[in-house]
Amino acid sequence: MSDKLTILRDLKSYLQSNYSNSVKDIILFGSQAHGNSNENSDYDVLIVLKNDYTARDENQIYDLCYDMNLKYSIIIDAHLISEKELTTIKGRQPIFSKAIKSGIYA
């Protein structure tokens, strides 16, 4: 678990340094968080942003996640949501509500 936390914290720090301080939370969910992953499992990560974001912002964040993929030889499957979206129907989708409820926070 400590390796996963190291990766999560490094990802959060990297995004805050290279994207902006609008990154509120990084949450690991899915098989990596629940202990039923294998060597081919990706890292499902929910990135909660303080502000709204554009497609350009999304692409920038995905590029930064790719840097972390290379650094750790993993695959990050990033999902973005803003704090504002958490209060909408998008935020109530099971993928997001489960991640927030039972995921591992950086």
Identify the role of each PLM range.
Residues 1-25, 34-39, 49-106:
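Catalytic core of pol beta-like nucleotidyltransferases
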